[in-house]
Amino acid sequence: NIFISDKIVSSEVVNFKKGARIFTISVKDPERYGVIKLLNNIPVEIVEKPKEFISNNAVTGLYFYDTEATSLCKKLKPSNRNELEITDLNKVYLKNEMLSVSSLGESETWMDAGTFESLLDAGNYIAALQKRLGRLVGSPELTSYNQGFLSKSDLLEFIKNAPNNSYYQLLKSSIT
């Protein structure tokens, strides 16, 4: 999953207190995703890749959990794939009436990257956006620098030792 937004995390983290919060977006093909059914904006059901229509609200894969999540995960049973499923954790919060839902707005972009085709589409979209804007989109190094987790000298040293390619050239031009 790939998200592009300037404000989604900062505003939601500030307001998040207890329980779990999941993010949704309306899609035209809900059978490809986990979806959530809402009644009066209250979550009532989560279904992974529903065969019959229940909702267009796809669960995007962006979640916030409180400190109870770890202990709740320890109680989950592995799925048929022998994995603990995030949907099952969300269902526990739903059952306990501790699940809240936020919808992504029109200024936020979500791209599924769960298939080869959707990953390629997402990569091409970001490449085109970077080319048009002339700046990096979604760079973890640049975000770390802008948030004060990396100093300019540390980032420049990192770039100096990195491969010489357009990504690192653009990263360097973003901070100099």
Please provide the spans of the model-predicted regions.
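Conserved beta-loop-beta/alpha segment of the NTase-like Rossmann-fold superfamily
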Residues: 1-40, 64-67, 71-76
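Weak global preference for isoleucine
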Residues: 2-4, 8, 22-25, 36, ...
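Catalytic-core segments of class I nucleotidyltransferases/pyrophosphorylases
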Residues: 13-14, 42-149, 153-154, 160
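Secondary-structure boundary/capping residues
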Residues: 21, 99, 135, 167-168
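Short, amphipathic C-terminal "tail helix"
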Residues: 149-150, 155-176
